[in-house]
Amino acid sequence: MVDFPGYNLSGAVASFLFILLTMKQSEDFRVIGPAHPILAGVGEDALLTCQLLPKRTTMHVEVRWYRSEPSTPVFVHRDGVEVTEMQMEEYRGWVEWIENGIAKGNVALKIHNIQPSDNGQYWCHFQDGNYCGETSLLLKVAGLGSAPSIHMEGPGESGVQLVCTARGWFPEPQVYWEDIRGEKLLAVSEHRIQDKDGLFYAEATLVVRNASAESVSCLVHNPVLTEEKGSVISLPEKLQTELASLKVNGPSQPILVRVGEDIQLTCYLSPKANAQSMEVRWDRSHRYPAVHVYMDGDHVAGEQMAEYRGRTVLVSDAIDEGRLTLQILSARPSDDGQYRCLFEKDDVYQEASLDLKVVSLGSSPLITVEGQEDGEMQPMCSSDGWFPQPHVPWRDMEGKTIPSSSQALTQGSHGLFHVQTLLRVTNISAVDVTCSISIPFLGEEKIATFSLSESRMTFLWKTLLVWGLLLAVAVGLPRKRS
């Protein structure tokens, strides 16, 4: 018999034979699950099942249900009791072990009140002593949402714009338009977003060139359930409504506001009309979620974007004349950009665009000397708290721009910019230079002046002082030794 250093071959053979004799063979221990995906509707209960073969009791076998990691299970059943220590938090109190069938190796787990987050793959894992087996199951969650709503914008130069909206769908639905003959119409834009519950909101926009004799349908299709919901709009009928002949106006110039100030977004109907029975909506680029929605005399909080909650106030003193102002409290850099103001009644709306420019003048620039490179100093100009991104040139006393050696603009967590710029001092004959930080469209700037000549003299005197001290030490040491 051949022996390897530190290893006994006869002992290894004995261990191998022991394992063969004690290990359960895979052909005698199998786990099977459903042959097809399990379909469950949002809000319903789902039953996940699997079976141990050959059929035998699973009372003293560990059964573990998990999603992706066995260490964080959906449910664990061991020695006849539920084990909850490592259970995923989102399944606590929402899963139920079904006892029926465990004597024959059948196990089942019921998940109550199915949500979109439950969609996907699950694993059923058996552990009995030294052997384990598992199988996977696919749970398909589906939900039919609301029937689509079709909103029509009053006629414009390019035709009539239709916006189809639907919410509460899962998975992501398909939205398409059809004419009166059932032929597909091409949407000009589509938008989908998942809400906090995982359900989809869908929006599709269509432009109809010939609105004189058209009925148009919008259909929303669930690809899992192969079911759909639809709505039809008659354009000639809608063109006779009140809002089709009105216009919405807003400020002709951009609205300028500084960070921390309150924003005023005003829009009004022309000619004047009472808007008390209308829906008025301010949004960014899509109808949902919105900045603020007024409907039936009240604010609709459920449609509001999270970043505007608690920050909007509607001024409706002149609502009977069709004039409304939305106040957004304490402007932030993220508020900067385009807004839309929409008046809607009987699914017909008119809109105006508003351009909001949020600005912040930062701190006065500070110039420090960062040392030297190739025998020259490196003046650095820095400042905090700017928005939008500022313009940061160095200039000589004649106003001519001097190229910087580097410039860094970083945006902080609140959206404000911090700027740092280093001056290229090589071959500069200027005595003084300025660091100017400005926001071009605001027409304001902050300036700091730096004297190169004084800094060179200060730098020279510091250098001479250091050399003088070194020389004194060098001369004094030999005398002390003597």
Curated annotation (Swiss-Prot):
One GO term (biological process): positive regulation of interleukin-2 production
A GO cellular component entry from the record: external side of plasma membrane
Listed name of the protein: Butyrophilin-like protein 2
Membrane topology: Single-pass type II membrane protein
Entries under SMART domains matching the protein: IG (SM00409), IGc1 (SM00407), IGv (SM00406)
Gene Ontology molecular functions: signaling receptor binding
Gene, per the UniProt record: BTNL2
Segments on the Cytoplasmic face: 1-6
Key words, A-Z: Disulfide bond, Glycoprotein, Immunoglobulin domain, Membrane, Repeat, Signal-anchor, Transmembrane, Transmembrane helix
Organism phylogeny: Eukaryota, Metazoa, Chordata, Craniata, Vertebrata
Localization (cell): Membrane
Purpose of the protein: Negative regulator of T-cell proliferation.
Record family assignment: Belongs to the immunoglobulin superfamily. BTN/MOG family.
